[in-house]
Amino acid sequence: MGQKVHPIGMRVGVIRDWDAKWYAEKEYADYLHEDLAIRQLIQTKLADASVSLIETERAINKVIVTLHTAKPGMVIGKSGANVDALRAELNKLTGKQVHINIVEIKKPDLDAHLVGEGIAKQLEARIAFRRAQKQAIQRAMRAGAKGIKTQVSGRLNGADIARAEGYSEGTVPLHTLRADIDYAWEEADTTYGKLGVKVWIYRGEVLPTKKSVKGEK
């Protein structure tokens, strides 16, 4: 059977950038484990803050963490109380100085992670899986998506045999490297077990910018 490559991994270095922007030699393993611990802490503390992407950069004894969120007010808190508490915990965890930057996601309906999270929460609230998917697709298309595909798999409606069911609208060209495709998968904990949610969103083509050559007039 044909398998699908991860759409984001395939585009890293072409139209996507790395989530961790640092280089290390002997300390690589330590930095990697530290990054994983940072991500785990943030995802636990800000589970309801619609955080889609966590980027890390490093300097000497300093870590810069950039959070992409649809709810910046919830991350910052009253007078910055929440972000200060998070910074203090990250400082303690890493033993380094941690700087936190917050970037607002203007269109959460075009973010695969947030769309998948929304579908998963609806499934946990016992909303029909077909309805949850179709509503998410309608919202994404209204927000300006060129195409979207969703899939829910597991014991749908408590069926004895697990299956996968998905819907799509528009085009989702997975083979086109210049196509800006956002992909994410989430899990929903239901009374019948876990359901997997996958979302692919095609946001249009990223055209390569012409690089100026020295001496070119």
UniProtKB/Swiss-Prot annotation:
Keyword presence, Glycosyltransferase: no
PROSITE patterns referenced in this protein's UniProt entry, alphabetically: KH_TYPE_2, RIBOSOMAL_S3
Cited SMART domains: KH
Residues covered by the KH type-2 domain: 38-106
Gene3D superfamilies linked to this entry: 3.30.300.20, Ribosomal protein S3, C-terminal domain
Family matches, as CDD domains: KH-II_30S_S3
GO MF annotations in UniProt: mRNA binding; rRNA binding; structural constituent of ribosome
Entry keyword set: Ribonucleoprotein, Ribosomal protein, RNA-binding, rRNA-binding
rRNA-binding listed as a keyword: yes
Domain of life: Bacteria
InterPro entries according to UniProt: KH_dom (IPR004087), KH_dom-like_a/b (IPR015946), KH_dom_type_2 (IPR004044), KH_sf_prok-type (IPR009019), Ribosomal_S3_C_sf (IPR036419), Ribosomal_uS3_bac-typ (IPR005704), Ribosomal_uS3_C (IPR001351), Ribosomal_uS3_CS (IPR018280)
Any one GO cellular component localisation term in the record: cytosolic small ribosomal subunit
GO BP annotation list: translation
Assembly and oligomerization: Part of the 30S ribosomal subunit. Forms a tight complex with proteins S10 and S14.
The family this protein is said to belong to: Belongs to the universal ribosomal protein uS3 family.
Function of the protein: Binds the lower part of the 30S subunit head. Binds mRNA in the 70S ribosome, positioning it for translation.
Protein's name in the database: Small ribosomal subunit protein uS3
Organism encoding this protein: Lactococcus lactis subsp. cremoris (strain MG1363)
The organism's taxonomic lineage, starting at the top: Bacteria, Bacillati, Bacillota, Bacilli, Lactobacillales
The gene coding this protein: rpsC
